[in-house]
Amino acid sequence: METRRSNLTYSVIKEVNTKNGPHMVGKTTAMLEDCGFDACHIVDKITRNCTNPVFSINGVRMLDEYYVAKSKLNVAAGDTFNEEEGKRIARERVLDKYHSDLNEALCAYLQDAREIVARLENYMLKHNIDYSSALTEDEIKWSKLSGKK
């Protein structure tokens, strides 16, 4: 999965010196920083484009401030050190962690939004309030999100 982020950094340790001489480590660490408000920024951008923005980002779960993942050379299996491959593996792992957390936060917000809609519709039905003029979810998708009028 791709990322547009510039805050992905790498730390590469090829070998370490021991009392018995150099020892091949081949460890690559990828760190994705400054992630805490990412889900909030996405929800804020979406809600700002609503016809009547009434939802806020107060209920959006914060992400971890940073994510870390590593790849390590398996000397016993006969691996040879390849810095680019180590970076690719570490990058893939850190982005998997990040996107899993981001998706979980966005799904939780969506669940809350759907519950609000269900509770509001239930209230309006109980009190005989006509809400037929409000667009349905499918009508909103068709008219506002597909570019069609």
Predicted region positions:
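Catalytic phosphate/metal-binding cores of nucleic-acid and nucleotide-processing enzymes, i.e., regions
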Residues: 1-149
